[in-house]
Amino acid sequence: NPLSYPYEVYKNDKDAAYDLIEDMCKNIYYDKSNDDPFWNNMASSFISGLVASLFTFGKEDEINFNSINALLSHDGKLLKNFVMAKFSSNSYVSTMTMPTISSTSDTRASILSVAREPFCPLVSRKRLSMLLSNSSFSYKDIVSKPTAIFFISKEDDVRVNSLISIFIRQLYM
């Protein structure tokens, strides 16, 4: 579960967790061939805010990509009301989500479309979704004990390669 390590960090150091969340989201939405990074950058910031809101109010077993995908199914008005009711205007969650939530309906729809795109293949495939919903290891154990890790994936599977990159980056942070 790519969110499990940032969530563990969040319990003791919110700022460090926000760095991990932002790094993960930038990795998910990075597209070197994109001439207009605005949409991916906005989607990345928005998802960073949703993840932080999930860390604040979600139960531990809800901290996963399936929950983020479920949050993305809500309309802008519901999300805006939730953020405004639960978070101060200068909170991390508000700072990251309000630019999208408060934008015009066409702009918001475009950002949400970009935000949803990478999650569809991750949550629509049952085995992958289950794999990404929990962690069977501790990052602390991996870095403190001799450990071998094997990744088996298709070379051209950009989404899975992105997840592998996120995993490796989290090990070094």
Predicted regions and their residues:
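P-loop NTPase motor domains
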Residues: 1-173
